[in-house]
Amino acid sequence: MTITPQQLIALLPLLIVGLTVVVVMLSIAWRRNHFLNATLSVLGLNAALVSLWFVGQAGAMDVTPLMRVDGFAMLYTGLVLLASLATCTFAYPWLEGYYDNKEEFYLLVLIASLGGILLANANHLAALFLGIELISLPLFGLIGYAYRQKRSLEASIKYTILSAAASSFLLFGIALLYAQSGNLSFVALGKSLGDNMLHEPLLLAGLGMMIVGLGFKLSLVPFHLWTPDVYQGAPAPVSTFLATASKIAIFSVVMRLFLYAPVGDSEAVRVVLGVIAFASIIFGNLMALSQTNIKRLLGYSSISHLGYLMVALIALQNGSMSMEAVGVYLAGYLFSSLGAFGVVSLMSSPYRGPDADSLFSYRGLFWHRPILSAVMTVMMLSLAGIPMTLGFIGKFYVLAVGVQAGLWWLTAAVVIGSAIGLYYYLRVAVSLYLSAPQQLNRDAPTNWQYSAGGIVVLISALLVLIFGIYPQPLITLVQHAMPLM
């Protein structure tokens, strides 16, 4: 098989990140230098982001039977790269106080983002499985990076067990689908499923297994078991990557699979997905109510956000508005999560014990770090879906899609979930403005806004507000990513 220059251009983000992985590996082997390797990683990710412009000029194409590069792939590749960039940026000050080898952290983030890009472009079940493994395996190491802390090591082991269970279910489901249809390509699967094969027991069993596997990866109820423990134990920059890049990449490939293969046409599958979405929204929000640890709280809130997205996924057969809703919602979720976890990262460092994840650490933050408190408040309001923030636009889209598709009980769940969510997000926001404790046990650096991590947090807050007030540029961008399917 010969690859044309056009196809090489279409693969540029993947090739650039792959090349960066090799360069960083060689750089570590040659000489350990934290600043040099962090810079190389950030430059590589930035170059991959810039290359998306050239990919757009090349147009939509099937590069290999495993991958399709189009507007959809470009949008989600861009979001994954932004999340990876933010992770590296937050990790630099966090790793400055780390006693052991710092450089491998960037290497693992780059390999995981490579998996994310592969997932965004995947057009075949083999690429889906490869991408999921490529994004999961580096995370085992990243979650346990602060291995001197018991919680970090525990989180790593729990995530490894969860991942192994998910992969085995997923692989078995893929095998059953292949046994029945003889195809692994999304398009060919779509044709097989279109020929009234959706009632075949083997096919339904395969789909069920895949839903279980992907449910583990997306931390949907009832497959969310140790998700909050993993968020709590992982270093703050890794929690950022877990909440954003890994979720966005996996959700994008699930959406492409549902677009090509009309899985939602089966009433049984729709009911199962509906129950999972309903349970994720209600359970995620109810469990977050009692949390006093901000990383656990954000872990439970990520379960409910994925539940909201599932509503749009179930309504996918009802037109392109669902795809638009998912694109806008994920962009809002990305920037809100980057800001929230960014603040936690700025307040944390490995040599001061566990991360600053207790709500008490943020009490009265406004009185000595007013701008940082304002940023955190904006992020909490956006995650809660308050008007004038990007989170509201995403929630509004999901509600509109639910109403349009006639998913009344799921739309009611979104409304109830948002009402419950309002309480615990505002609890975090209000604690920032209470009187500060006598002795500050945690604080961000004095000049935090001049650090790279601080700039990322401020830009995220600005984008959440700007797109919340005037969302048209973002909506146009998401719409442009759709017709190239």
Swiss-Prot record:
Which reaction is recorded as catalysed by this protein?
A: a quinone + NADH + 5 H(+)(in) = a quinol + NAD(+) + 4 H(+)(out)
User: Has UniProt tagged this entry with the keyword Nucleotide-binding?
Assistant: no
Instruction: Report membrane topology.
Output: Multi-pass membrane protein
Q: Which InterPro entries match?
A: NADH-Q_OxRdtase_suN/2 (IPR010096), ND/Mrp_TM (IPR001750)
Q: Does the keyword Transport apply?
A: yes
Cellular component GO terms held in the UniProt record: plasma membrane
Major enzyme class? translocase
Q: Which GO terms describe its molecular function?
A: NADH dehydrogenase (ubiquinone) activity; NADH:ubiquinone reductase (non-electrogenic) activity; quinone binding
Name the predominant localization.
membrane
Q: Name one Pfam family in it.
A: Proton_antipo_M
Sorted alphabetically, the keyword list is:
Cell inner membrane, Cell membrane, Membrane, NAD, Quinone, Translocase, Transmembrane, Transmembrane helix, Transport, Ubiquinone
Task: Enumerate the NCBIfam families for this protein.
Answer: NDH_I_N, PRK05777.1-1
**Which PANTHER family has this protein been placed in?**
NADH DEHYDROGENASE (PTHR22773)
Subunit comment for this entry? NDH-1 is composed of 13 different subunits. Subunits NuoA, H, J, K, L, M, N constitute the membrane sector of the complex.
Similarity comment: family membership: Belongs to the complex I subunit 2 family.
Q: Per its record, how is this protein called by name? A: NADH-quinone oxidoreductase subunit N
Please tell me the species this chain comes from: Enterobacter sp. (strain 638)
Q: What is the lineage of its organism?
A: Bacteria, Pseudomonadati, Pseudomonadota, Gammaproteobacteria, Enterobacterales
